[in-house]
Amino acid sequence: MEIRRRPPNPSVKVAHLQYAIPHADAEPRHILEKIVWEKDREVETARQRVPLETLKSQIADLPIPRDFIAALRQASRAPAVIAEVKKASPSQGVIRADFDPVLIANAYAEGGASCLSVLTDKSFFQGGFEVLVEVRQTVGLPLLCKDFILTPYQLYQARAAGADAALLIVAILSDQDLTYLSKVANSLGLNVLVEVHDAEELERVLNLGGFPLIGINNRDLTTFETDLETTETLSQQFATRLQQQGVLLVSESGLFNRADLDRVQAVGAEAVLVGEALMRQSDVCAGLQQLMIGDEGTSNS
C-alpha cells in the first residue's frame, strides 16, 4: 500500500503578493492518508515553534531511557501488556470523556501493565506531547510514544517528552525512511516498535533486519476495521523468520478479553497492546487485571 505524502501547493506571484494554489487532486484517499497529510502540517508548525536545537538541549538533561523491550521480556504474566492512554480515535470518537492521564497511568501501573503506550497525536486522537509529559512524571514504567512518525524531529519530540520507545508504522514509511528513523531513535536511546498490518509490510521489515520488536496491527488503518486473524495469519506465515531474528512479537488492537489474549499468544505473540477495551472500563485497574487473569481471577475471588 502506497501512502502519498501531502503535495506542496504551487504558488504564483501577483504584484507584490504570493498566493498558494491548491492542487486539483490534493485530497487524501482514505483516513490514513488524511492523518499523514495533517501530520506533515503539524510537524511544520511545531518546528517553527520549538526548534530542533531547543529539543536537543532539553534531552541533554534527561536520564537514560528505560528499556522497553526488556520490560516486556521480564513480564511476570504472559503475554505482557502494553496498556494504552488514549482519549479518542477517528473511528470511535471520544472513548473516555473523563480522561485523566495521571489517574489512568497510575491505575495501569497498579494493575500490572509492563509498559504504557501514550497517544501524542492531537488532531485525530486528542492526545499530545503534554499528555506524555504528564504520564512520564507519574509512573516509572517504560513509555511508548504512539504517533504517526514521519521525521526525525518527532523522535526528538518524543524523547524530550519522556518516551522510552517510539512507534514506526511501516505503511507510511519507505524502507529508507524506516531504516533512517530507526537509527535516529536508537541514537536517542529509544527502542522502536515497528508496526505492520500485512504480509508485504512484514516481509519488508524482515528483509531489512535488525528490528527486535515488531507489532502486528489487527486494525487496517485505511478503514479502521479490526480482525484478530491478522496476527494469526502473519505470525504463522513468518514464524520461522521471526524466530530466527529473535523478534518479540506484539499483537495490537481488537483485544478485549483474556480469550483474545490466549488466541494471539497461541500463535507466538509475547505481548499485546490494548487501548479501547481498557479505556471503556469504569475501573481501569480492575479491568486490566481481569483482562490479564480472565476466569482465573473470578474463580479465586
UniProtKB/Swiss-Prot annotation:
CDD domains: IGPS. GO terms for molecular function: indole-3-glycerol-phosphate synthase activity; phosphoribosylanthranilate isomerase activity. It holds the Pfam family IGPS. It comes from the Bacteria. One of its GO terms (biological process) is L-tryptophan biosynthetic process. Keywords: Amino-acid biosynthesis, Aromatic amino acid biosynthesis, Decarboxylase, Lyase, Tryptophan biosynthesis. It is an enzyme of class 4 (lyase). It catalyses: 1-(2-carboxyphenylamino)-1-deoxy-D-ribulose 5-phosphate + H(+) = (1S,2R)-1-C-(indol-3-yl)glycerol 3-phosphate + CO2 + H2O. The keyword Metal-binding does not apply. Coiled coil: none annotated. InterPro entries: Aldolase_TIM (IPR013785), Indole-3-glycerol_P_synth (IPR045186), Indole-3-glycerol_P_synth_dom (IPR013798), Indole-3-GlycerolPSynthase_CS (IPR001468), RibuloseP-bd_barrel (IPR011060). Its EC number is 4.1.1.48. Pathway: Amino-acid biosynthesis; L-tryptophan biosynthesis; L-tryptophan from chorismate: step 4/5. HAMAP family: IGPS_B. Belongs to the TrpC family. This is Indole-3-glycerol phosphate synthase. It comes from Prochlorococcus marinus (strain MIT 9313).
